[in-house]
Amino acid sequence: MSSLLLSSISTFFIVLSAVLVAIGWALVKNKKIEAHKKTMFAAAISALTFFIIYVSRTLFIGNTAFGGPDEYKIYYTIFLVFHIILATTGAVFGIVTILAGYKNNLVRHRKIGPVTSIIWFFTAITGVMVYLLLYII
């Protein structure tokens, strides 16, 4: 498989995870707790699928160097740096939030859940921008 195809598939899964997080957030706001749990679990699986594809692509194919126009390289670099920071932070917050929910530590889960969600939304947005700048533009 090509780097472009694997990157396209992994980008789909990270966007899917963000969409599912948004749906899960709306569900919990409407007191649909069981649907929230299932949707957030699906979001976590989608994010994990992204991560597995990303790591596999990196290990077996390698990183893709920026090959676009020089005037876009600074934007690519800025989005990439922010994406790496957000993705790392979001992953840690995500694990802590999920564990708090499954351990029924709802005070902690409710406190950090919205923060985690917002970080994840920005992670997905910056990830899509990195993808677009690397493969499309």
Predicted regions: what they are:
Residues 1-137:
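Alpha-helical membrane insertion/targeting regions
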